């Protein structure tokens, strides 16, 4: 690495808005740097090439043409050999040397937007290719005489600031013609892959460059596989020990070996020694409509951040080619091994202005063709990525407000990028540029024509989406005729595409719109869609009562299932039906007691009577055994009978008790918990009441309970417990029916009995002092 400079080697302030600095430090060399346009004192042992006079002449020429011209973008190469290199440059394009003497980085910088730092060291120059070498122009006369160059690229007068993650921050100059100053046309494809396009204007560069009279005595040889680029100052002697900087730029593997150079201050020793190759950025500007040149904006202390503003007169169409950047803050994805090289991607992705204008004019027709052939999901998902690549970077920058002004001022750039065919076909990779067109550029379409075409395309897409939604809603509601009247008529091809897409979308949206009531209707939607069309006018009255019947069908089925269950008793139910709770359902018990189903009530009543009479004659164990044998004899006999019948009739009806075998009779945990809680409540209430009566909490209640027990002694002497239970069962099945039939007479007699009982109780309470006091 080079030794750090002396403290006296400080950079002086800029001489003007277009002045640039040139400084490169060799090994052990300390050279003072002077601004351009000033006359430095020649050092000992070095001839004065007389550049001071020419610099003063260029300075006077610049002062005369200051307000009418503006400095172009210049290529700047700086050395990082100085220890105090500033890291203020946000984006640098660097190539590290092998021997570790110093790292050279090159960037395109506009001095209007970025004021130079006090410790920045770099040099500027306009490259011209002469016999395979690019030489820095040292005089205005040499700069004004360009060598053999390639065909001119159609220029554009861009007013916005374009910045990217790849290290390029530029403000294009006010020029109507952009020239690539490269000499050999045969080496065009080789040079375009990894060389900068110097954007300048030959007739206006004489006042831009005023070089320092004392340049570095070092020759930087960029040794590539194809070309050798050397920077040789005119009038300065050759150094004895040149510091070559080698870069492994191979055109076939340029994208695979390209890496993004980190900031200069973050470079480690290994990174400085290893060569780092960075893919350059190619920026091509195409002029659509020329406009009047604006005056040069002077950089004053009050207006240091003034940049070019977008003009309403121009509508630029800009295509920026960026190298892949794998840094976290970059939106450009890194390149992979499968991507094509720079030359291949440029040949495939470059389009001319004729093709661009033709694609814009055919945008409306392409929109309908794409509607007929819907794109796969992968291409539709890649569209936001393409738009993200073509858009400006999202990293924070002090010039973001200037970059946003270009977007807000010229909306045609965003509209052109939104073209579905141009966004996917014209941007296959990260490197895209307009091809060279010989002769004058063709007359492009006016901004109003472009805007009208794009607007019609967007409106056609919106109308097609509206009609698709209308067709989807027509199957579930009656709002489709209204929407079709509001929407404009479409072409037959678009309508056919809509009909094809309607079936696919209906399968996805029908379950959510129609509900679970029609599980299989949306599957037959394409075939059943044309059928209700002709039947809709005469069948409006018939369709309206059917649609509300759909949610009512489950309710009717449930009610119909409950009524036969109550009338016909327990029958074969499905496996998903709730388990029958015999004698536990209140409504079912009421139906049994009131003989609403005579057959079912008779079976239950006879079973109880048989059980009770059996218990009166036999013990409980004998009754259980006899009942089990009777049930088994009945079921076995029926099973054999059905089997013989099926064998004779040669039928296969299956098991005769199959429905009962599949019937779910298990009690769930919730049901058991429910009845257990109910039983617990009654048991606890009974225990509390008995405790209160036996402990004479209330004397009257305890006396009543005593009288009841005295009467039960007489009942027990007359009847057995089973007889009482039998009488209770008979009364339970007979009294409700008798009460319903003779309710009026029974109520009358019950009223008389209640009155007589109340009178007797009142007399008893009058004779008992405690009872009277309690009644008061």
Swiss-Prot record:
Domain Reticulon positions: 589-776
UniProt keyword Phosphoprotein present: yes
Residues spanning the membrane: 603-623, 705-725
Biased composition (Low complexity): 328-341
Modified residues (Phosphoserine): 327, 350, 352, 487
Annotated GO CC locations: dendrite; endoplasmic reticulum; endoplasmic reticulum membrane; Golgi membrane; neuron projection; neuronal cell body; nuclear body; postsynaptic density
S-S bridge residues: none
Modifications the protein undergoes after translation, according to the UniProt entry: Isoforms RTN1-A and RTN1-B are phosphorylated.
Name used for this protein in its record: Reticulon-1
Region (Disordered): 1-101, 137-168, 205-245, 285-580
Keyword tags: Endoplasmic reticulum, Golgi apparatus, Membrane, Phosphoprotein, Transmembrane, Transmembrane helix
Quaternary assembly: Interacts with NDRG1. Interacts with BACE1.
Example GO BP: neuron differentiation
Pfam families: Reticulon (PF02453)
Compositionally biased tracts (Basic and acidic residues): 497-511
Purpose of the protein: Inhibits amyloid precursor protein processing, probably by blocking BACE1 activity.
Subcellular location: Endoplasmic reticulum membrane; Golgi apparatus membrane
């Amino acid at each position: 690495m080079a030794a750090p400079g002396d403290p006296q080697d400080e950079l002086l302030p800029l001489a003007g808005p277009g002045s640039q600095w040139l400084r490169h430090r060799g090994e052990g060399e300390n050279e003072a740097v002077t601004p351009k346009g000033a006359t430095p004192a020649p050092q000992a042992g070095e001839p004065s090439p007389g550049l001071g006079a020419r610099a003063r002449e260029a300075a006077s020429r610049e002062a005369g043409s200051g307000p009418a011209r503006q400095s172009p973008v210049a290529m700047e190469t700086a050395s990082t050999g100085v220890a105090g290199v500033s890291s203020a440059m946000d984006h640098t394009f660097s190539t590290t040397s092998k021997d570790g003497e110093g790292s050279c980085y090159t960037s395109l910088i506009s001095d209007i937007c970025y004021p130079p730092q006090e410790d920045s060291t770099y040099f500027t120059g306009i490259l011209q290719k002469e016999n395979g070498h690019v030489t820095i122009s040292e005089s205005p006369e040499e700069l004004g005489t360009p060598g053999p160059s390639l065909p001119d690229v159609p220029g554009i007068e861009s007013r916005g600031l374009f910045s990217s993650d790849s290290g390029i921050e530029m403000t294009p100059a006010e020029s109507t013609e952009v020239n690539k100053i490269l000499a050999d046309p045969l080496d065009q494809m080789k040079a375009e892959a990894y060389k900068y396009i110097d954007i300048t204007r030959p007739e206006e560069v004489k006042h831009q460059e005023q070089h320092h009279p004392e340049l570095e005595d070092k020759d930087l040889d960029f040794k590539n596989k194809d070309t050798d680029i050397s920077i040789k100052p005119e009038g300065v002697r050759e150094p004895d020990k040149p510091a070559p900087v080698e870069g492994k730029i191979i055109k076939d593997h340029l994208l695979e070996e390209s890496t993004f150079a980190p900031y200069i201050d973050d470079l480690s020793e290994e990174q400085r020694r290893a060569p780092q190759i960075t893919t350059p950025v190619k920026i091509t500007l195409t002029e659509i409509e020329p406009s009047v040149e604006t005056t040069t904006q002077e950089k004053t202390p009050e207006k240091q951040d003034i940049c070019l503003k977008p003009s309403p007169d121009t509508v630029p169409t800009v295509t920026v080619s960026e190298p892949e950047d794998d840094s976290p803050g970059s939106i450009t994805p890194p390149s992979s091994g499968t991507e094509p090289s720079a030359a291949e991607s440029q040949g495939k992705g470059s389009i001319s202005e004729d093709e661009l204008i033709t694609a814009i004019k055919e945008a409306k027709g392409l929109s309908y063709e794409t509607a007929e052939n819907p794109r796969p999901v992968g291409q539709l998902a890649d569209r936001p990525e393409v738009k993200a690549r073509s858009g400006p970077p999202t990293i924070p920058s002090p010039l973001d407000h200037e970059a946003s002004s270009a977007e807000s001022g010229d909306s045609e750039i965003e509209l052109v990028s939104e073209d579905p065919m141009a966004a996917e076909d014209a941007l296959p990779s990260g490197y895209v540029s307009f091809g060279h067109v010989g002769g004058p550029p063709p007359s492009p379409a006016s901004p109003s024509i472009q805007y009208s075409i794009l607007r019609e395309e967007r409106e056609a897409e919106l109308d097609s989406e509206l009609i698709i939604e209308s067709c989807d809603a027509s199957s579930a509601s009656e709002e489709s005729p209204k929407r079709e009247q509001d929407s404009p008529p479409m072409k037959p091809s678009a309508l056919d595409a809509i009909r094809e897409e309607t079936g696919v979308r209906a399968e996805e949206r029908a379950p959510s719109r129609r509900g679970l009531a029609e599980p299989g209707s949306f599957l037959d939607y394409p075939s059943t869609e044309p059928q209700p069309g002709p039947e809709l006018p005469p069948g409006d009255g018939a369709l309206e009562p059917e649609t509300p019947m759909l949610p009512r069908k489950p309710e009717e089925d449930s009610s119909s299932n409950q009524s036969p269950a109550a009338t016909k008793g327990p029958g074969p139910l499905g496996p998903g039906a709730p388990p029958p709770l015999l004698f536990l359902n209140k409504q079912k018990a009421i139906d049994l007691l009131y003989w609403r189903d005579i057959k079912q009530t008779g079976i239950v009543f006879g079973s109880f009577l048989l059980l009770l009479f059996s218990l009166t004659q036999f013990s409980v164990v004998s009754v259980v055994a006899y009942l089990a044998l009777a049930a088994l004899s009945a079921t076995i006999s029926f099973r054999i009978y059905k089997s013989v019948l099926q064998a004779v009739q040669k039928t296969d009806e299956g098991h005769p008790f199959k429905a009962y075998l599949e019937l779910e009779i298990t009690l769930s945990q919730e049901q058991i918990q429910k009845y257990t809680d109910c039983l617990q409540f009654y048991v606890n209430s009974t225990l509390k009441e008995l405790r209160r009566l036996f402990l004479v909490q209330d004397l009257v209640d305890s006396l009543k309970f005593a009288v009841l027990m005295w009467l039960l002694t007489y009942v027990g002497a007359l009847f057995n417990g089973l007889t009482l239970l039998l009488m209770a069962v008979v009364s339970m099945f007979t009294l409700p029916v008798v009460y319903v039939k003779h309710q009026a007479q029974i109520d009358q007699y019950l009223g008389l009995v209640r009155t007589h009982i109340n009178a007797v109780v009142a007399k008893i309470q009058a004779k008992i002092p405690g009872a009277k006091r309690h009644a008061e």
